[in-house]
């Protein structure tokens, strides 16, 4: 029996060459997983350790050729014991590194900073483990080429240096986060602290905030549905403070199609979505609200994804869900529809169900579209022009046409016509793209086709109508947060600023709308300021006709949150016109003017702006705004009143101090005024005894 067991155990042990091959596959799998993560984009590491994570990822990816040579190596019978002994520690180290990189990509950004000591120990441990594993590799026995060996040795040298100096997040950042986490900070400094945190944590967009919220939910779920405890509750509180701050600074941050409507004049105006209409997971307006077994309501797509990920607890309450059944919340859906109609918005459409496919084009319609696309490829300019014009009209007509035209492959063909020497063809093509971009799915197709440089080319060089429609196309595309980055990085902003200065009234409006959307992204604000946007905007604000006043004030409010923008606005002597706007503007312009003033009075030259505001009589309109303004306007007015009050108290104290100092200094007689033998003995002699100096 014992002999049988020994034979069985010997049979289970794989030969050395098999173990070596398994170790190679572990190493390869880890390196490939890191490379796949890097393919998702460097922006995935949007946290305080971005630089360290990118460096670690880059060094591991440099091991790719080493892995390829290991895989190609042939092993003879009995070989592999030393190879397995050398590669097993490397596989362990790479798997630990992969886990750390995943934490950096998917973990809570707030938690990563609060746990910085633990995180830095993980970095040190992984780097030390990798450095030691690479040091012990027997290159000669593994038959590695000299070129690959040099590359691996380079990685080893980099890790050796990195082991000796691993930078931690700066102390100010950590202390800011800790002070809000512990609720131990000066309330007057709260806005400045939250501003620094939102920027350094990369929590500036609705996408970032949603991702962080999901990461915190994941931390709770990984605890087995138990009480999340004070630590996670306090992090959730901290995230809510940052979210409130970011939405206060950029009230139009949310999904633009849900948070901006057109007024009776056709102008775009922002609108705040009530919290009870937002999904607790995505923070977006719910299209298809459903109730889970705990009584909480979520957007159907979000909660289905949560459940499909293996979670069995309610994201909000952390109670275990007794069933995964979802009940439509018809009452809330009706309330959302009524609210949308009251505010001039189109009620949100529920996602199309798989068993209810979107109606396709009829065969005759598809044949017509295909014929037009063939003409777009024609060498005859006249045929190209007429086909582009007809597609432009078809895309304008209805949503179904937009879907069919895009599915037929029109987008790349229209893009090729943006460089046409025929200005009318170019104009029809860019306008057709504008009409196609109205459909949400087409936005992604246009961007992924590399459209932005071609659209910017038209914006710079086309006819005035083509330039205006190019600006409108960029506005349509820029409602998606990720596309703001793409468009801003490809030279669109300076061209939009030029159009804002020299276009027709419609062109200026389209340029202003696009610039507003793009400047919601913090990285684009500096580009716009350096392109000369602030002087143009100040010109619109002071224009006696009031044309584009709403757009100008909205853009000014966004730019004032940027240090360069604050400086440029401050240099334009804005205080008198802002005070006048606070007193007599429209409700939205009053709140934006107050927001700009608040930024100016928080900056480097705040005393100058506070003094100028006092001279212009800001207190009365501020008090009125604090009582009767919009919600955001009231908040800004109250904050400004507090700053003005502190400034006035400080001024009064300085004046009183100067008066007291003057009163304590006795009059000094000089030899020219009083002869030496006439100097009185008493210091309190009547002033009339002294000669008057004129």
UniProtKB/Swiss-Prot annotation:
Highly expressed in leaf, at intermediate levels in shoot and weakly in root. It comes from Oryza sativa subsp. japonica. GO terms for cellular component: cytoplasm; cytosol; nucleus. One of its GO terms (molecular function) is ubiquitin-protein transferase activity. Residues 650-667 have a biased composition (Low complexity). It catalyses: S-ubiquitinyl-[E2 ubiquitin-conjugating enzyme]-L-cysteine + [acceptor protein]-L-lysine = [E2 ubiquitin-conjugating enzyme]-L-cysteine + N(6)-ubiquitinyl-[acceptor protein]-L-lysine. E3 ubiquitin-protein ligase that negatively regulates programmed cell death and disease resistance. Participates in flowering time control by mediating ubiquitination and subsequent proteasomal degradation of SPIN1. Residues 1-12 have a biased composition (Acidic residues). Residues 272-346 form the U-box domain. Residues 1-21, 343-363, 650-694 are annotated as: Disordered. This is E3 ubiquitin-protein ligase SPL11. PANTHER family: E3 UBIQUITIN-PROTEIN LIGASE SPL11, U BOX DOMAIN-CONTAINING. The gene is SPL11. Interacts with SPIN1 (via N-terminus). It is found in: Nucleus; Cytoplasm. InterPro entries: Adaptor_Cbl_N_dom_sf, ARM-like, ARM-type_fold, Armadillo, RING-Ubox_PUB, Ubox_domain, Znf_RING/FYVE/PHD.
């Amino acid at each position: 029996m014992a002999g049988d067991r020994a034979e069985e155990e010997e049979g289970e042990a794989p030969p050395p060459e098999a173990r070596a091959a398994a170790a190679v596959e572990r190493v390869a799998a880890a390196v490939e997983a890191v490379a796949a993560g890097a393919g998702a984009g460097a922006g995935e590491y949007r946290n305080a350790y971005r630089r360290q994570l990118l460096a670690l990822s880059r060094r591991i990816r440099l091991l790719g050729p080493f892995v390829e040579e290991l895989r190609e190596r042939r092993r003879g019978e009995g070989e592999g014991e030393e190879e397995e002994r050398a590669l097993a520690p490397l596989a362990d180290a790479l798997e630990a590194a992969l886990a750390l990189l995943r934490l950096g990509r998917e973990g809570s950004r707030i938690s990563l900073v609060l746990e910085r000591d633990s995180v830095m120990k993980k970095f040190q441990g992984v780097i030390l483990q990798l450095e030691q594993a690479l040091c012990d590799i027997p290159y000669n026995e593994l038959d590695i080429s000299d070129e690959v060996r040099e590359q691996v040795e380079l990685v080893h040298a980099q890790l050796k240096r990195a082991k000796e100096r691993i930078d931690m997040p700066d102390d100010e950042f950590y202390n800011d986060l800790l002070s809000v986490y512990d609720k131990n900070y000066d309330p007057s400094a709260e806005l400045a602290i939250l501003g620094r945190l939102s920027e350094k944590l990369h929590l500036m967009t609705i996408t970032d905030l949603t991702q962080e919220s999901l990461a915190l939910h994941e931390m709770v779920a990984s605890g087995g549905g138990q009480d999340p405890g004070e630590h996670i509750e306090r992090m959730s509180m901290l995230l809510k403070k940052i979210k409130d701050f970011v939405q206060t600074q950029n009230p139009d941050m949310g999904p633009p199609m849900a948070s901006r409507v057109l007024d009776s004049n056709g102008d775009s105006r922002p609108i705040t979505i009530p919290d009870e209409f937002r999904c607790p997971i995505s923070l977006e307006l719910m299209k298809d609200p459903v109730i889970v077994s705990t009584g909480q309501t979520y957007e159907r797509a979000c909660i289905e994804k949560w459940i499909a990920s293996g979670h069995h607890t309610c994201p909000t309450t952390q109670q275990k869900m007794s069933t995964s059944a979802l009940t439509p919340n018809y009452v809330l859906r009706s309330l959302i529809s009524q609210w949308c109609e009251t505010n001039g918005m189109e009620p949100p459409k529920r996602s199309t169900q798989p068993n209810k496919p979107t109606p396709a084009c009829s065969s005759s319609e598809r044949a017509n579209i295909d014929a037009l696309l063939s003409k777009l490829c024609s060498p005859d300019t006249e045929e190209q022009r007429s086909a582009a014009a007809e597609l432009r009209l078809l895309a304008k007509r209805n949503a179904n046409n937009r879907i069919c035209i895009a599915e037929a492959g029109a987008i790349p063909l229209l893009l090729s016509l943006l460089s046409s020497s025929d200005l009318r063809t170019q104009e029809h093509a860019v306008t057709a793209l504008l009409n196609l971009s109205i459909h949400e799915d087409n936005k992604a197709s246009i961007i992924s086709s590399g459209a932005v440089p071609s659209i910017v080319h038209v914006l710079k060089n086309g006819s005035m109508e083509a330039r205006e429609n190019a600006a409108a196309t960029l506005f349509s595309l820029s409602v998606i947060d990720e596309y703001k980055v793409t468009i801003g990085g490809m030279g669109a902003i300076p061209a939009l600023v030029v159009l804002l200065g020299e276009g027709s009234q419609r062109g200026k409006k389209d340029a202003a709308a696009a610039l507003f959307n793009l400047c919601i992204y913090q990285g684009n604000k500096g580009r716009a300021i350096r392109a000369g946007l602030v002087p143009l905007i100040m010109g619109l604000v002071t224009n006696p006709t009031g044309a584009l006043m709403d757009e100008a004030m909205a853009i000014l409010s966004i730019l004032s949150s940027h240090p360069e923008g604050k400086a440029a606005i401050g240099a334009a002597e804005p205080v008198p016109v802002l005070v006048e706007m606070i007193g007599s503007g429209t409700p939205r312009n009053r709140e934006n003017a107050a927001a700009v003033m608040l930024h100016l009075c928080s900056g480097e030259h705040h005393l100058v702006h506070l003094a100028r505001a006092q001279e212009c009589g800001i207190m009365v309109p501020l008090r009125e705004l604090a009582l009767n303004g919009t919600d955001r306007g009231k908040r800004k007015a109250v904050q400004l009143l507090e700053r003005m009050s502190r400034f006035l108290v400080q001024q009064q104290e300085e004046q009183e101090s100067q008066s007291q100092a003057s009163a304590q200094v006795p009059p000094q007689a000089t030899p020219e005024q009083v002869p030496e033998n006439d100097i009185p003995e008493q210091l309190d002699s009547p002033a009339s005894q002294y000669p008057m100096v004129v």
